[in-house]
């Protein structure tokens, strides 16, 4: 499998969006990829978390990386997280 590299943009949102690099890598390596806007790809993976986020407890965190597959690597452009 190709190495995964994170853009500066994606890395800049780790804290504010509440995802871990390992979660994103797991999503890309284990979930089905779907076409996304601008010729990019995305995928989604749910993680059980029981996390308090912005003062509310959530049972599930969904991580949705948006990325491109290049010849030698996968580049993560951004990562969205959803809590429910």
What kind of feature is each model-predicted range?
Residues 1-84:
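Ribonuclease/tRNase effector modules and their secretory precursors
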């Amino acid at each position: 499998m190709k190495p995964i590299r994170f853009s500066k943009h994606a890395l800049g949102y780790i804290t504010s969006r509440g995802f871990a690099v390992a979660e994103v890598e797991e999503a890309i390596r284990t979930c089905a990829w779907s076409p996304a806007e601008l010729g990019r790809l995305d995928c989604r993976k749910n993680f059980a978390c029981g996390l308090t986020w912005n003062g509310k407890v959530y049972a599930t965190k969904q991580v949705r990386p948006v990325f491109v597959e290049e010849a030698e690597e996968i580049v993560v452009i951004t990562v969205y997280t959803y809590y429910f």
